[in-house]
From Swiss-Prot:
Any GO BP annotation: translation
UniProt GO MF annotations: structural constituent of ribosome
Organism classification: Bacteria, Pseudomonadati, Pseudomonadota, Alphaproteobacteria, Hyphomicrobiales
Record's keyword annotation contains Electron transport: no
Family: Belongs to the bacterial ribosomal protein bL36 family.
Tagged with keyword Nucleotidyltransferase: no
Pfam families referenced in this protein's UniProt entry, alphabetically: Ribosomal_L36
Annotated keywords: Ribonucleoprotein, Ribosomal protein
UniProt source species: Bartonella quintana (strain Toulouse)
GO cellular component: ribonucleoprotein complex; ribosome
Protein name, per record: Large ribosomal subunit protein bL36
InterPro entries cross-referenced by the UniProt entry: Ribosomal_bL36, Ribosomal_bL36_sp, Ribosomal_L36_bact
Amino acid sequence: MKIKNSLKALRERHRNNRMVRRKGRVYILNKTNPRFRARQG
């Protein structure tokens, strides 16, 4: 999982990316291609 300051560019890298907020953190999740996962931090 990558940790990035800005997730907007990462979200657009794959069409199945989903932006999710959990416990005050923002994640990008991708079930079809998990290598695109990221967390904002």
